[in-house]
Each structure stands twice: as structure tokens, then as C-alpha cells.
UniProtKB/Swiss-Prot annotation:
NCBIfam families assigned: rpoC_TIGR
EC number: 2.7.7.6
Organism: Citrifermentans bemidjiense (strain ATCC BAA-1014 / DSM 16622 / JCM 12645 / Bem)
Functional summary from the UniProt entry: DNA-dependent RNA polymerase catalyzes the transcription of DNA into RNA using the four ribonucleoside triphosphates as substrates.
The protein, known as: DNA-directed RNA polymerase subunit beta'
Residues at which Mg(2+) binds: D460, D462, D464
Annotated gene: rpoC
């Protein structure tokens, strides 16, 4: 019916536009767009409820309130279309124009637009070169500004206070013009000549001497250039008339009881109109200046409040003391227009309900309650009912559905077939939070979810709810089925390993059936084929876990079957394996890890379809055997180790011993604390180890009656061992000891909880543990928010990283090697290069054969080849070095992790990267409290043991031999390697300064032999020569104080900070003749002492080479938890400078110390050729290099964390990327979370995409401009084509927030943060948004230029309107595992 009214309207096509521009509106523009002036503050008549004429809701200006009906009722209905009623002046048209017609208010005096005034930096202030403070004084009528100096010699734009103005008047009489308020500012802005000003400023900039002046001029120049280029006029920043929003967008809604609910805007407009009308009247009456001035100020304030309430002064509040919501507030923040309505909308055809488990569903199905389906599929049902001839009209179909007649259910079944629905669980942290399923109708009101997809949704069935959405168009159904179906999302986009893996009870069931039991029924029997095993099992002749031998093929490639040792359960499990998967994959105890591997292997060898079938069968068999096993736990399963009292007593004695050392003054309090913590941490680990050994071994009698140790079937152990539930840490607390706890401040309490939960805690122990438990819960709440915010920033910065071309043809890449930490490999090279593309041919180091040709994807088989060849380094293509101008090319990205093949064009890899990094953030934050707040802290490493036997090799180690014959390391970057006979390095360790090496070069080392040791809690200062100790500048009370320990009564000398910059506390070593001893040729044995170091020697005593003369204590350690982790990740991605960052050297060279300057130490680095570079290091910071050390560029000269900006400047992009990737990965690795490197690289690429112009050459760029790298390259190409000089620039590292805000698209930036600031800047520049990214297009309501929305795929249209039938996965032949056993 409603269509009939719009019958005469021309059909409105959606507007086709390719870009959108924002600029400042001129007063003429505002009036031109307006449909009339609003003159009165009235809204509607209180009796008739009709809009008042000329008021805020006036029908004459904004259109009729009812369709095709004028206000007075003279003209009604369609036949009078377009007539203007002569009585009330209302046009007879549809009422929806009230949503689009603007009005305006003519102001009696000009008013400044608050955005251009107060949004920092103030644009009006910048243009006129007046400070914001002065500008406000002028605008709010507290000061005068000179608008025309004429010939008085006053400067244009000088600001006078009232007194100064009177004086100036006396001095110059009326030889100049000055004014106050926005009118005066407008006069100034109008009279500005931008071209002349711009030239003058450019000259000033070249002549400027100080950096500050240059920067200030550059800022002004930027604003002026923006105005010049955009065609905006400066005076438009001052308003003469104000547009009035269409009334439907600021509605007045009658509530019951005769009251009205209104939008705050109406109040704000009313204020403006009232003050404006009063001002007009006062001006007509020629009121005194003071009164008019006050009224003008009030008008300015009213307009300010309308545009941005609370930006200046106190926010205007409504009757309920709540600040009124202004136009800016409508756009800003989470509930503003951008984020609430444009980026995410609520949709129809959706519902939500509680979820329950659906173990009998297939992987691609979900159970949908009939009630829900009936509501969701209504239009489809009506259509089918009509088609079937059950009804003739929609109305009767409606009735039929309401009555729920039997035919309706039949039709519903038919409609649902082949029509996927989307299920979504909030929070949707990654793309697997929305997946498509085929609905199966079920009774009841809860949605049934397949148990295997719970991991992806992070769902459990303790009351979680999920939403259902229905894709309507054929295109969307195809996309849902092909791209979003749960069966097509087996691999996780974050790390490329399967995410559809059995968990919890399924794991337990499969683990139980693949375990082997000693001396079970049928042990040692030999079977000719797996079928025989099945027969024997059905007959009850063999036990499920009996160890038997079967003739069969172990690998698919085997020539003929062989006898294989296995168990009954594993042979039964073999029945569900696809043929392509070798038996060896499951001929072991299947833990969760092994199951994950099985799904992975199946996906690679047998393909997607087989994997889906296998996953479903694993689910069924897992549930079945978990039920059959009937595993339960009792308190007796928590076996407390017998050795526990002994270990605790030993630890208590050690602690007492350390306490005694402390009372004797041998160690400091900090050392004592650290050692005590270490003893307890180690004891806890010992008890845990003994307990786990006990749990995992049972002693039973064999048939001969001898005792044998066999793997145990203890239920708790099985659950943890299989990976079904629980961890060693939790079992440790149940049956070992709870261990150390953390204080609220994060420090560790040095008395641990020696009891466990089985023994029960004492009151004190319980009290200590409450804190940790609560902290866990509080952390969770806080960090979920932080993690969500991190994800939001990441998505925003990476949203335009899309695969746009197949190959960019770059010749650059990254070199990747295995990651080692403390000598052990934590990530193999194979894992790091899998799915990447080789940059050059990868050659076998021995034979020289090509293992992988250049530009080829490195898949599983090639990785095996590379690892077999023993390659240490491989060059691969990387997102960081990709040369695509917009987006990224497929070759540089490599494999699409979720699909297992090279990435497709149009894939939004940036968003996937952001989700992959952000999602575990939330997971991790939610994982703190499960351990119950027990302090997890590794015992510090204090010694190195050789893992392999071989010969010791010193690499770059300077050492002296001390009196005991040990080698003491005297430099920082030395390494100790163990090499075999052929000279190949088997392992390599960095050794710290001051470490004791217990072997000599080339000495034979046995496996497990201790080769080096050091004190992890202090940094020693050692002497390199023997001699007598002499102190310099060690003056008590000035540079040193004796700290007396309250407990021990002993004193120690500690260096303190001093005001006196000339005093440099040091220890000198004198030789026999009393001169300062020399180290080598020309270095003096003089050791400077940093603040906080403890002096270990007395003056005048004799020392030997390698003796410790002073110690610098390290900070006491805090617990490592992702709490430190999440802020750490944010800090890395925000590219913040660390608090005490280390100064690094920019060149290779030799270190020397210069004279101190201004309380800072001067370090000189002298290269072989060229000038030495000097670095100033704050006093009291420990300098980690020694005189005469050789340093490489990028090495730190002092203790502290690295500053990423320095790394970029000194070592370049690749090193920076490597640093960021490694640091971020370390945080996640500590939590056991896997993320592929390429995701972090993608984000880093987005952080590095801008450059800062250093020298403009012959281009149109401005100095210090920050621009996108490809814009810079294009400008240079243009200049060089004309034979000009190219510009130079330096790489910039922007934090993710900065990078998001500096994107090309103003719509995207405005919807992210600081909306008003972004829009202000964009409108001054007259910015054009060419809608290239994802966000801008979502906001404009277009298809996004990624995935199927890419122009490449856009012209593919669905031709067939018939139902698209995609064949079902074939029913598996062997269905017996679904049937219940008789």
C-alpha cells in the first residue's frame, strides 16, 4: 500500500560516487541549502500539537507532518501533490522530507565556530598568529584587536586590554581601527592576503635560525597552504548564519501523560534563537554598549554549546543537571553516529538464545529451535505457502503461520533445506566468531551447537548465548556456504594449525582407548589383519588396551604389510582413518597434541572433505569411549609424594643458612631475598616433579609375581597427561605444595604455602592465598577492556592492508633463522618459513642442488628437505619488503593460513593479522586466575651445562685467569660454543660479564658438564690486573654512605647520587711503584662506580686479576604474567619510548671515555676511519661498555631497554621489524600462544608506511612533512622525469594510534578517535576521501573493496535465481560408529 504514494516519484537509484569531499560551508551555501529562516524558539502548539509557524518544527520550512496534507487541512490527498497551500504556506508532499530539509538562523552578529577556535591547534589563532588565550579574550569581549592600523605603526592583529586600548586611543586618537568579538576577527581574516603571507613565511623559514621558530612557521604555513589549496576562505570560520538540523533528526515525541521527550538539540537551538532575537531587539533599541556586548557574548556561548557543549567553560546542563548533548557529541565516541550506527547496526532477521551441546550433529549443522526458525524464515514460508497453493494472499498465509498448522511445519522443513544461517557469539574477537551452519529443526528453545566448534567461538555451555542471523540474498547464501561454513574453517587463521580439534571428554576417550596396559587379557597375541582384531574384540577375547601384534601397513608408502606392535584400541581407531593417513600417525598414545597433529596431517594428505568426516568420527568415538572408560576422580587419586617432608626440611635448613650468611654480613638483604625465593621455587619444582613421577608410575606384580613399574591409570594423571583438563601446575597445588604467593604489589612473599589442597590450608595460608585469587578476577575485568581496545587500534591501523596483486616483483626480503634462547632452539627454522615464498633459489649447502626455486611457496615437503639439509638461514619474501603501492602482493604474503594455499587476491590480511594478535590478548587476560594467583617464576639460571660432548671454543671472549685458575670473562658480547670433531657448532651460549668459565679453550667437554657459572642477581665490577686498591672521590656523605643493616648491624659502602658534578667515585688499582697500573698498552686500571653499587674491597688491600671489587644489585624480580604482557604488546605497537632507554651507538668503533659534561658521562666511539661520535649518558646509569671495547653499530652503551626509534634510525627497517616481531612473540610464547610472524609483520608494515621529508629537492613537498612512502616515491619520480633533484626523507615509525589517525581517509580516521580534531583538519584542507579502505566504505554503505567486494570479482553476478544446490559431503560408508552399541 505504501508504495502507491510514491508511485509518481522517479525510482531513486543509489547514487554512484567514487569519492566524498569535506570542506567549510560559506554563509551563502548555508542560506542556499536552507528552506527558510527559523525565527521563533517555539516548537509545537500546546493545544493542537501542530508545529508553530517559523518555529523550530515549522511545517512551512521543513515540510508537512502528515503525508500529502497541509498544516491547516485545506489540501489533503495525492491529487494536490506539489501545491503550496496559500493559507498556511505548506507544500503538499510526503512527510519524509522532514528528515532532509535544512533551515537556518540569521545571526545578528557573527560568531566564531568553536571547532576552529578550540580544537588544538587553534586554526584561527594559527592563521592570525594570536595565542588562543588572547583570541578568546577578543571573542568573549574582554579585549580589543587591531583590525586596521592605518598609519599608526601598530601591528595588525595586536591585542589590547581595555586599559591599553584607552591609552592607545589617547596616543593615536582615532588613527586606527580596533574592535572586539567575532566581527572584529572576521574583519581581520577577510583582509588577509594568503598568497603574500605564504611567500613571506617561506622566506622566513629559510632565514630562521632556531629550530623552534622554524617549526612554528611551518605550522602556520601548513594551515595557510591548506586554505589556499582547498578554496576555503578563512572568514568562513566565523559564522553569520547557522544551519538548523531537519526536525525528524531531533524529534519531539509525546509521552503518555501529556509530557514530551525531546532531543537536547532543541534546547540548544532554542537558547540560540532566544538570545539572537533579544540581541536584535536590543540593537534596534540602541541599548548601551555594555548590555549589547554581554548579549553578544551570550550568543557566542550559546552557539558554542550547540556545536560542542563543554568544549569551553562549563557544559550547559538541562533541567536534570545532565549536560546537554551537542552536535559534536552526536558524532563522538562509542555511542556516536560513527561507531553506533554506521560501523555496526542492529539488523532484522536475527534472534538469540542460550546454547546447548549437540553431540549428534554433523560438523556443518546446528540445531535451531522450531519457534525461532518459524520467525526467521517467515517471508520464505509465506512465499512457499502461496506457491504450494495452500493460501492465496499474504494475509491468509500470516494467519496460517500464526495458528501453526501442520502444513506450515512441512513447508518450514523445505524452506530451511540448503539455506545456511550464521551463528555468532559475542565477543567476536576473530573471524571464527561468526560461522555458517545448516539449520536442523529441534524442539525446545535452545540452539544446539556442535561441540568441535566451541574452541573457535570460545563457547561453553554454562549459560552462554548466541545470535542467529539469516543471509537473505542468493549471493550472501553462496558466500556463507563457500566461505563461512564451519567445514571450511578447519584451520586457524592465526597460526595455520587446526582449530577444529577434539577437546576435553573427547580427548580423554581417545587417550583412554589408545593407552596400553601391561598384562591385560590377550597380551602378546598376533593377528593376521585388523579385521581379526575386530572379531576378537567383539567376542571379548582381548582387552581394549592389550598390547598385541598385527600384520598391516604402517605407512601408506610401505610395500607390504609387516608385524606391528600396537594395541586393540588403536586398531579400532584405525577404522575411522582415511586411507591416505598412515597408521603410524595414531600408533601411539593420542594426547590432545597428537590429535591436533592427526587432523593437520589428514588435512594435508586427504583434503578438506575427509578431514571433516574424520573430525565427526573422532567426536563420536571420543564421547563413546569416554563414557565406556567411566573415569572419575577421588581424593585418593591425589597422591602426596613421600619425599615431601624431607624436601621441605632441606629447604628450611638452606633458608636458615642464608639467613645466617646475611646476619654475618656476607650478603645484602636483596641477595638474601632473591636466594630464599629461589630455594623455595626450586623445592616446589622438586616436589612437583616427584609427585608427577609418582602419579605417572604404578607398581604392579607381573605373572611371575615380580614387582614392575608401569605407566599408571591414575585418573588425575590421565586427565592432565592427555591434555583434556588441568595442568601440572594445578595438580601440584592439589597434591604437591601450593608454593610461593604474590603480594598485592606483585612482589613474592618469601614464605611459601607448604601445604596443598588435599592436606588443607591453615588460616594464615588461606589468608595469604585470598589475595592472589582476587587479583585474578580483578585483572580479568580490567584486561578484557584493554585487550579489546588493543584489537580495535590494530584493526584500525591494518584495515587497508589487502592483497591487491599477485606479485610486486621485489628483489628484497628477510633472512630467517631458527630462534634460540639460552642455547636451546625454541622455534625451528621450518616453523618460521612454512608457507612463505622463497626469495632466491634455496640451495643444498653440500651438493649445491636447488631445494626450492625462487618465488616458490615453501610447503611441508620442502620444509622437510630444508631441515634435512641442515640450512641455518633462509631468505624469504616478506610483507615488510613488499613494493606494492597500495596493499600487499600475494607472493610477499605467502600462504593463506586458514586455507593452506597461496593467498587469494582481495583477502583482507590486515584485519586477519589484527584479529590474530588481538584475540589471544583477551584469552590471555582471562587466563590469569585459573592458577589461583600462585607466583609463577622460573628459578634464575646460574650455570651453563653442556648438552652435547665436544670441545670448548671461545668466541670473542676476553678473559683473565684468577687465583683459583678459573677464567673470568671481562667483556660483554663473548660467546662460548661447543664444537664437535669436524668443527661444527653443536650449541652456543652468550656469556655475561663476570662469569666464571670452568673450561679452557679447546678443552674436551663431557655431556652434562658444568662449563660456566655466574651470579644472576648482581652485576660485578672486576679488576683486570693485580695490585693495591685505592679509592678516588669516595667521600662519605657526599658520594658514598655507609648503610647499616638493621637486622645484622653490619655496614656496607653504597655509592649515592651527588649534586657535585666534578666528583666521580672510582677505584684505582696501583702497582708496586704506587703508580696506577696499566691494562695492556695504554689503558689505566681505573673503575668508575655507578650509583647504587656496593664496594666489596677495603682501601689498600691487595687484589688479584679477576677479583670482584664492587657489585651492582639487580632489581628483585616480579612475577611474569601476561599482565606485564598485554601492556608490553601495546607499548611495542604504540612504538613508545621506554622510560629509561639505552643510548645506542650509531657506528662501529672503539670506546673511550671523554670529560664529563653537565653531570653526564661522555662516551666517545671512534671508528677506524672518520670522526669519533660522542654520546652523553646520564650520571648514575651503569655504562655497560669498558674503555677499549670494540662495539658494533646499534649496540647499547648502557643498561636499559631498546628504543625502537633508535633501532630504526641506526639499523634500518629490517632490524626494527625483527626486534618488534621477536619481542611481541616472546610475550605470547610465555603464555603458550602461537601466532604466525607474518601477522606481526603486517602490522609493523603499517606502522612504517610514512616518511618524514628532510630535504625537498625540486618537489612540491614541504620540509618536515609526514607523508605515505608511495606518495613520496611518486613525487620523486615526477621531479626526476623533469630532470629535477629528488627529495630525501627518513623512515618514520608511528605507533598504531598515530598511524590510524594519519591515514589518507578522513572518514576512517574520524570514526576511530578524536573525531572533532580529524574533521576540523579535513574540512580546512578540503580533503577528498577516495574510499579506498574498508572502513570508509562500510560507513558509506557500499561493498568493501576486499574479498568478494573487490572490483575483480564485482562483475560476477548471480544469474540463476533457482536455488543453488551445492552437493552435500557424501555420507560416510562406515556409519557404525554413529549407532549405539547393542
Amino acid at each position: 500500500m505504501e508504495d502507491i504514494f510514491n508511485f509518481f516519484d522517479k525510482p531513486k537509484d543509489p547514487l554512484h560516487f567514487s569519492s566524498i569531499k569535506i570542506s567549510i560551508s560559506s554563509p551563502d551555501k548555508i542560506r542556499e541549502r536552507s528552506f527558510g529562516e527559523v525565527k521563533k524558539p517555539e516548537t509545537i502548539n500546546y493545544r493542537t500539537f501542530k508545529p508553530e509557524r517559523d518555529g523550530l518544527f515549522c511545517a512551512k520550512i521543513f515540510g508537512p507532518t502528515k503525508d500529502y496534507e497541509c498544516n491547516c487541512g485545506k489540501y489533503k490527498r495525492m491529487k494536490h501533490r506539489g501545491i503550496v497551500c496559500e493559507k498556511c504556506g505548506v507544500e503538499v508532499i510526503p512527510s519524509k522530507v522532514r528528515r532532509e530539509r535544512l533551515g537556518h538562523i540569521d545571526l545578528a552578529t557573527p560568531v566564531a565556530h568553536i571547532w576552529f577556535l578550540k580544537s588544538l591547534p587553534s586554526r584561527i589563532g594559527n592563521l592570525m598568529d594570536i595565542t588562543l588565550k588572547d583570541l578568546e579574550k577578543v571573542l568573549y569581549f574582554e579585549a580589543y584587536v587591531v583590525t586596521d592600523p592605518k598609519d599608526t605603526g601598530l601591528a595588525f592583529g595586536t591585542v589590547f586590554s581595555e586599559d591599553q586600548y584607552q591609552k592607545a586611543l589617547e596616543e593615536y586618537s582615532y588613527g586606527f581601527e580596533a574592535g572586539m568579538g567575532a566581527a572584529a576577527i572576521r574583519t581581520c581574516l577577510t583582509s588577509m592576503d594568503l598568497d603574500q603571507l605564504s611567500e613571506q613565511l617561506r622566506i622566513e623559514m629559510q632565514e630562521a635560525t632556531s629550530e623552534a621558530k622554524r617549526k612554528k612557521t611551518a605550522k602556520r604555513l601548513k594551515v595557510i597552504e591548506a586554505f589556499k589549496n582547498s578554496g576555503n576562505k578563512p572568514e568562513w570560520m566565523i559564522l553569520e548564519c547557522i544551519p538548523v538540523l531537519p526536525p525528524e533528526l531531533r524529534p519531539l515525541v509525546p509521552l503518555d501523560g501529556g509530557r514530551f521527550a525531546t532531543s537536547d538539540l532543541n534546547d540548544l537551538y532554542r537558547r540560540v534563537i532566544n538570545r539572537n532575537n533579544r540581541l536584535k531587539r536590543l540593537m534596534e533599541l540602541q541599548a548601551p554598549e555594555v548590555i549589547i556586548r554581554n548579549e553578544k557574548r551570550m550568543l557566542q556561548e550559546a552557539v558554542d554549546a550547540l556545536f560542542d557543549n563543554g568544549r569551553r567553560g562549563r557544559a550547559i546542563a538541562g533541567p536534570n543537571k545532565r549536560p546537554l548533548k551537542s552536535l559534536s557529541d552526536m558524532l563522538k565516541g562509542k555511542s556516536g553516529r560513527f561507531r553506533q550506527n554506521l560501523l555496526g547496526k542492529r539488523v532484522d532477521y536475527s534472534g538469540r538464545s542460550v546454547i546447548v551441546v549437540g553431540p549428534e550433529l554433523r560438523l556443518h549443522q546446528c540445531g535451531l529451535p522450531k519457534k525461532m526458525a518459524l520467525e526467521l524464515f517467515k517471508p520464505f514460508i509465506y512465499n512457499k505457502l502461496e506457491e504450494r497453493g495452500f493460501v492465496t494472499t499474504i494475509k491468509s498465509a500470516k494467519k496460517m503461520v500464526e495458528k501453526e498448522k501442520p502444513e506450515v511445519w512441512d513447508v518450514l522443513e523445505e524452506v530451511i533445506k540448503e539455506h545456511p544461517v550464521l551463528l555468532n557469539r559475542a565477543p567476536t574477537l576473530h573471524r571464527l566468531g561468526i560461522q555458517a551452519f545448516e539449520p536442523v529443526l529441534i524442539e525446545g528453545k535452545a540452539i544446539q551447537l556442535h561441540p568441535l566448534v566451541c574452541t573457535a567461538f570460545n563457547a561453553d555451555f554454562d549459560g552462554d548465548q548466541m545470535a542467529v542471523h539469516l543471509p537473505l540474498s542468493v549471493e550472501s547464501q553462496v558466500e556463507a556456504r563457500v566461505l563461512m561454513m564451519s567445514t571450511n574453517n578447519i584451520l586457524s587463521p592465526a597460526h595455520g594449525k587446526p582449530i577444529i580439534v577434539p577437546s576435553q571428554d573427547m580427548v580423554l576417550g581417545i587417550y583412554y582407548m589408545t593407552r596400553d596396559k601391561h598384562f591385560a587379557l590377550g597380551e602378546g597375541k598376533i593377528f593376521a589383519s585388523p579385521d581379526e582384531v575386530n572379531i576378537a574384540w567383539d567376542a571379548g577375547e582381548i582387552h581394549l588396551q592389550a598390547r598385541i601384534k598385527v600384520r598391516m601397513k604402517n605407512l601408506v608408502s610401505d610395500e607390504k604389510p609387516t608385524l606391528i606392535e600396537t594395541t586393540t584400541g588403536r586398531v579400532l581407531l584405525r577404522d575411522i582413518l582415511p586411507d591416505a593417513v598412515p597408521y603410524a600417525t595414531i600408533n601411539k598414545v593420542m594426547t590432545k597434541k597428537e590429535l591436533s597433529n592427526l587432523v593437520d596431517v589428514c588435512y594435508r594428505l586427504a583434503g578438506n572433505k575427509e578431514t571433516v568426516i574424520l573430525a565427526d568420527k573422532l567426536k563420536a568415538i571420543g564421547f563413546r569411549y569416554a563414557a565406556k572408560a567411566g573415569i572419575s576422580i577421588s581424593i585418593n587419586d591425589m597422591v602426596i609424594p613421600e619425599g615431601k617432608p624431607a624436601i621441605i626440611n632441606r629447604a628450611t635448613e638452606e633458608v636458615q643458612e642464608i639467613q645466617n650468611q646475611y646476619t654475618e654480613g656476607l650478603i645484602t638483604d636483596g641477595e638474601r631475598y632473591n636466594k630464599v625465593i629461589d630455594i623455595w621455587a626450586k623445592s616446589t619444582e622438586d616436589i612437583a616433579k616427584e609427585m608427577l613421577d609418582n602419579l605417572s608410575r604404578d607398581t604392579i606384580l607381573d605373572p611371575e609375581g615380580k614387582e614392575v613399574k608401569v605407566p599408571s591409570f591414575n585418573a588425575i594423571h590421565m586427565m592432565a597427561d592427555s591434555g583434556a583438563r588441568g595442568s601440572a601446575q594445578q595438580i601440584r597445588q592439589l597434591a604437591g605444595m601450593r608454593g610461593l604467593m604474590a603480594k598485592p604489589s606483585g612482589e613474592i612473599i618469601e614464605t611459601p604455602i607448604t601445604a596443598n589442597f588435599r592436606e588443607g590450608l591453615t588460616v594464615l595460608q588461606y589468608f595469604i592465598s585470598t589475595h592472589g585469587a582476587r587479583k585474578g578476577l580483578a585483572d580479568t575485568a580490567l584486561k578484557t577492556a584493554n585487550s579489546g581496545y588493543l584489537t580495535r587500534r590494530l584493526v584500525d591501523v591494518a584495515q587497508d592492508a589487502i592483497i591487491t596483486e599477485a606479485d610486486c616483483g621485489t628483489i628484497d626480503g628477510l633472512t630467517v633463522s631458527s630462534l634460540t634462547e639460552g642455547g636451546e632452539v625454541i622455534e625451528h627454522i621450518g616453523d618460521r618459513i612454512l608457507g612463505r615464498v622463497a626469495l632466491d633459489d634455496i640451495l643444498d649447502p653440500v651438493t649445491g642442488d636447488v631445494l626450492v626455486p625462487a618465488n616458490e611457496e615453501i610447503d611441508e615437503t620442502l620444509v622437510a628437505k630444508i631441515e634435512a639439509a641442515g640450512l641455518e638461514k633462509v631468505k624469504i619474501r616478506s610483507v615488510l619488503t613488499c613494493e606494492s603501492r597500495r596493499g600487499i602482493c600475494a607472493k610477499c604474503y605467502g600462504r593463506d593460513l586458514a586455507r593452506g594455499h597461496l593467498v587469494n587476491r582481495g583477502e583482507a590480511v590486515g584485519v586477519i593479522a589484527a584479529q590474530s594478535i588481538g584475540e589471544p590478548g583477551t584469552q590471555l587476560t582471562m587466563r590469569t586466575f585459573h592458577i589461583g594467583g600462585t607466583a609463577s617464576r622460573r628459578a634464575e639460571q646460574t650455570a651453563l651445562e653442556a648438552r652435547n660432548e665436544g670441545f670448548a671454543k671461545f668466541i670473542n671472549i676476553n678473559y683473565v685467569t684468577n687465583s683459583e685458575g678459573h677464567h673470568i670473562v671481562m667483556n660483554r658480547n663473548g660467546e662460548l660454543a661447543i664444537v664437535d670433531e669436524t668443527g661444527r657448532e653443536r650449541e652456543k651460549y652468550g656469556v655475561v660479564y663476570g662469569a666464571k668459565i670452568k673450561v679452557s679453550p679447546q678443552e674436551k667437554v663431557a655431556q652434562g658438564q658444568s662449563v660456566a657459572e655466574w651470579d644472576p642477581y648482581t652485576m660485578p665490577i672486576l679488576t683486570e690486573v693485580a695490585g693495591r686498591v685505592k679509592f678516588g672521590d669516595v667521600i662519605e656523605g657526599v658520594t658514598m654512605e655507609e648503610q647499616v643493616d638493621e637486622v645484622t648491624g653490619l655496614s656496607r659502602k653504597v655509592i649515592i647520587e651527588t649534586r657535585d658534578t666534578d666528583k666521580r667515585p672510582r677505584i684505582t688499582i696501583k702497582d708496586e711503584s704506587g703508580k696506577t697500573a696499566k691494562i695492556g698498552e695504554n689503558l689505566l686500571a681505573r673503575y668508575y662506580l655507578p650509583v647504587g653499587s656496593n664496594i666489596n674491597v677495603l682501601e689498600e688491600i691487595e687484589v688479584n686479576a679477576g677479583d670482584v671489587i664492587a657489585k651492582i644489585p639487580r632489581e628483585t624480580t616480579k612475577t611474569k604474567d601476561i599482565t606485564g604482557g598485554l601492556p608490553r604488546v601495546a607499548e611495542l605497537f604504540e612504538a613508545r619510548k621506554p622510560k629509561d632507554f639505552a643510548v645506542i651507538t650509531e657506528i662501529d668503533g672503539v670506546v673511550a671515555f671523554g670529560k664529563d659534561a653537565k653531570g653526564k658521562r661522555k662516551v666517545l666511539v671512534t671508528p677506524e676511519l672518520g670522526e669519533p661520535k660522542e654520546y652523553l649518558i646520564p650520571k648514575g646509569k651503569h655504562i655497560s661498555v669498558h674503555e677499549g671495547d670494540h662495539v658494533r653499530a646499534g649496540e647499547a652503551l648502557m643498561d636499559g631497554s631498546s628504543n625502537p626509534h633508535d633501532i630504526l634510525r641506526v639499523l634500518g627497517q629490517k632490524e626494527l621489524a625483527k626486534y618488534l616481531v621477536d619481542e611481541v612473540q616472546e610475550v605470547y610464547r610465555l603464555q603458550g600462544v602461537k601466532i604466525n610472524d607474518k601477522h606481526i609483520e603486517t602490522i609493523v608494515r603499517q606502522m612504517l608506511r610514512r616518511v618524514r621529508v628532510k630535504d625537498v629537492g625540486d618537489t612540491n613537498l614541504l620540509i618536515d612533512d609526514q607523508i605515505e612512502r608511495w606518495v613520496f616515491e611518486e613525487e620523486n619520480e615526477k621531479a626526476m622525469d623533469k630532470g629535477g633533484r629528488p627529495a630525501t626523507a627518513e623512515s618514520l615509525l608511528l605507533g598504531i594510534t598515530k598511524a590510524s589517525l594519519s591515514t589518507e581517509s578522513f572518514i576512517s580516521a574520524a570514526s576511530f578517535q578524536e573525531t572533532t580534531k580529524v574533521l576540523t583538519q579535513a574540512s580546512i584542507e578540503g580533503k577528498v576521501d577516495s574510499l579506498r579502505g574498508l572502513k570508509e566504505n562500510v560507513i558509506m554503505g557500499r561493498l568493501i573493496p576486499a574479498g568478494t567486494g573487490l572490483a575483480l570479482y564485482r562483475n560476477l553476478r548471480m544469474v540463476a535465481e533457482e536455488p543453488v544446490i551445492i552437493p552435500e559431503p557424501a555420507e560416510p560408508e562406515d556409519e557404525e560408529i554413529y549407532e549405539e552399541e547393542a
